[in-house]
A protein has these predicted regions:
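Active-site core of glycosidic bond-cleaving carbohydrate-active enzymes
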Residues: 1-4, 53-197
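Acidic/histidine-rich catalytic neighborhood
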Residues: 8-69
Length: 197
């Protein structure tokens, strides 16, 4: 029952990707809430890039699931061939100058290096493209998690817990599980750092 839904989503993505120097990508794209610094003096904040790892990761995982479902169901058609080509030639996750997974198509300086969003790590969680079987990306994901830090709202901490669990770091996972249970005072109207939101 899910295959027709996958197929229509894949059809949309196949028609939406464009060729870039690094491979196929959804373009242009933004990364949730975080900006990058641009210009000679790095004072200009921009949000739109040629592509983002987050959007590409979502497409990669969709294509991966669609192709796997087709193999299981014994379905192969013209769209299957297009999906295979795009999947094989998608812009891959890249590692930046600080050893982190790049959020955008270039190694732009983040406006907020400690931003609570980790959308560039979609292939770590909930995706399945960054694992111990991809050691360079796996370590770059760890570096990204450490660079962003542990602070965040409840939902952000939940994502970090799941990502640290995928890194098989029980100590860090446990630390964040304790943090997510941190009491947020009801008088506070907004608390973005200690499990609130």
């Amino acid at each position: 029952r899910i295959y027709p839904v996958l197929k229509e989503n894949v059809r949309f993505c196949v028609e939406g990707v464009v060729g870039t120097a690094q491979g196929y990508a959804m373009s242009p794209a933004t990364s949730p809430e975080n900006d990058f610094l641009f210009g000679e003096e790095k004072k200009e904040k921009l949000t739109v890039a040629q592509y983002t790892e987050n959007e590409n990761a979502i497409v990669r995982n969709l294509l991966r699931d669609y192709l796997e479902a087709g193999r299981i169901l014994g379905i192969r058609d013209e769209l299957t061939g297009q999906a295979e080509k795009i999947f094989e030639e998608m812009a891959a996750p890249a590692v930046g100058s600080n050893g982190q997974i790049l959020e955008w198509n270039e190694d732009f300086e983040e406006a907020d290096p400690h931003h609570r969003h980790l959308s560039q790590l979609y292939e770590l969680h909930p995706g399945r493209g960054i694992t111990e079987k991809t050691p360079e990306l796996y370590e770059a994901a760890r570096t990204s998690l450490l660079r962003r830090g542990d602070a965040g709202t409840g939902w952000s901490l939940a994502w970090k817990i799941l990502m640290w669990a995928r890194m098989k770091d029980g100590v860090h996972t446990g630390k964040l599980m304790n943090e997510i249970l941190h009491l947020v005072e009801p008088k506070e109207s907004m608390n973005m750092a200690n499990g609130g939101g």
